């Protein structure tokens, strides 16, 4: 609501005020609640109407000229009888605007959103394996192949590293469902000390065991392996909501730094299997640089595909905070406005606006540090500056300011004011009640974001709006103080002018009361009050002006005002005239008064003057009389108008709260580039490890899902029997898959291919030898079975006995050879007989077994013949068959 006051005052009194008011262009509120006198326009009043009460602004409001014009209305006024009286108001107390401002002094601590990442120390354990193949031919070696990889170190070896500072030269690792071993320089395993690396930075230190690899030999190919055990001290960084962290090496670990298995609340984020994560209590770590053993702490270990990482276990609420202290303000002022508080920070030239309800800080997630930090800062400021002059008033209050700033405010009260307050409370026999603190439940701002674990304050990146708020508040305070002074001066001026009006009512009460009421009235002074009667409007056609202003019968006397004859109209208003209604058509003698008023009677006379020239207002125009005779009618526009009216439109500046306008959010600024570094690094690390889950290799699907689905089908449809059958199916499938996987792995090995090639060549050679033996057996079985029994072809015949001198000796030698040959033949026949007999028995047993199995599957009933045992094959029958 806006109210304006326009009052006609003299030029000299407001010459200074004009210059000030021209500069004030901001609209606000100004109301004046003056009380005065006015009409009670009831149609049941008498001819002289009683005066009721109207406001002073209503009385003088009609005097503000919208456009300079003269009303074409004429009124007839009767002499007041005293039935309606009025009085002028007394001077009033002038209010000062500055007295209404409620200010509270105190100490403020301003918090902002903590956008800094959480930084903590980690230790990286891994073995760097390098396999190099070189070629040399009595010349400089050439590298033909190189393979580099990193493998994690198991927990038991990490314990040895942290205790003794030594690491093994052997690396055992698992890749593609197989275990591998690597040895440094292809030598036997040994313990090597960890020595500092020359490559260091402010955020990382490294220790390793070797930097030398035997890469070549003088002649031929050489494949050499080096195993370097590396331990790195790094800084890791994690940002809210702390679901992963990154290291200076560029590696990212997809687990929260606050992850723990033993927790009662919701578990933190992790994509690793439980067996990869270890929590060790009272673990001691040796500083490899100084050799000192650190105090025991709870230690976390995580085994990744390429490294093992260790860090100290931490409590999330004790380690991180979503808010951080921005500034401390020893002299802060809280100004109370209609709907908000303004916290003015004079030293920082900033002002923050907030709601009037304190903010419930327990709603914030990970903001337990705020009360502690605020209390420590306020205690320090109070002890240094206010302990001897002020006392604290109430507890620390928190307010959420515009732009996402949390304000901790401690109210202060001077010793003198506090003593007066206590004395007043004791006098009233009760202690002062503190203002009830209400929580701002449900109050939402653009700076407060809700989450599953609690709310979080997001702070605007710029505080320019707070500086603008401070500037506006300073200008507002200055302008409002100036306007307050103007209003006070205006009030005092009205009081002084009221004294003048009291004196004017004694001289010309008609003009005074007409100007106050804004309409023609007739007034007469009755002691200290004024009798007032209302004037009746006379239509201009009911008025007849006379041309001469001379008094009939006396040539020396003339009328000072033009004379006229008028009559009241037949309108309902005529009933309020002094004449009766039945005489309304009779002419009434009168004179033209000031401001289009008709004076009943012709009592205003004066001695006639020479060169008389007068202008009298009638309706909208003026009547010109010269030598007391009407000359002509003059238009009002022909006469230059001089106005002394000055408008005073004093407006107080409104309360205005500046809010931050963020053109580009942080997310938009972060996404302005083509690539997002965090997303690229995380994707690259995940792609290099080739996992969907950290332990599920993409190419490691062996078809288990199909057989598992079959087993579930049996279990769901056949019940317990189906579950047992499904277990059998899964077992058989696992055996088949393992066999096939083993064969596939064997065939994929290059040594297996070489072994298979050698086996094929050996088999071919053995086959050719067997084929040659069979062909020789078919062509000459006696020679093959009994070598030497028959002389080979081309052997000269044995000489006859006649060529020998000693015939008896020759005959004896021949008989001996025959006996030896016969013995060999008999032994060979005996062996053949035994082999045939053995084969016949095996055949008979197999036939009986096959017959029994057929009867068993066919469920053939037993007969009496089946109860008799088979007769054994007699030995004499076998001998007869042989014969």
UniProtKB/Swiss-Prot annotation:
Glycosylation: residue positions: 102, 121, 211, 262, 360, 579, 635, 649
InterPro entries per UniProt: Glycoprot_B_PH1, Glycoprot_B_PH2, Glycoprot_B_PH2_sf, Glycoprotein_B_ecto_C, Herpes_Glycoprot_B
PTM notes: A proteolytic cleavage by host furin generates two subunits that remain linked by disulfide bonds.
Biological process, per Gene Ontology: symbiont entry into host cell; virion attachment to host cell
Transmembrane segments: 751-771
Top-level lineage group: Viruses
Span(s) of short sequence motif Internalization motif: 868-871
Membrane topology annotation: Single-pass type I membrane protein
Signal peptide: 1-31
Compositionally biased intervals (Acidic residues): 806-817
Ranges in the topological domain labelled Intravirion: 772-883
Main subcellular location: virion
GO cellular component entries: host cell endosome membrane; host cell Golgi membrane; host cell plasma membrane; membrane; viral envelope; virion membrane
Keyword Transmembrane helix applies: yes
Region (Involved in fusion and/or binding to host membrane): 134-140, 216-223
Region annotation Hydrophobic membrane proximal region: where it falls in the sequence: 694-748, 724-744
SS bonds (residue pairs): 77-535, 94-491, 167-229, 321-369, 558-608
Quaternary assembly: Homotrimer; disulfide-linked. Binds to heparan sulfate proteoglycans. Interacts with gH/gL heterodimer.
Family: Belongs to the herpesviridae glycoprotein B family.
Protein name: Envelope glycoprotein B
Top-level taxonomy: Viruses, Duplodnaviria, Heunggongvirae, Peploviricota, Herviviricetes
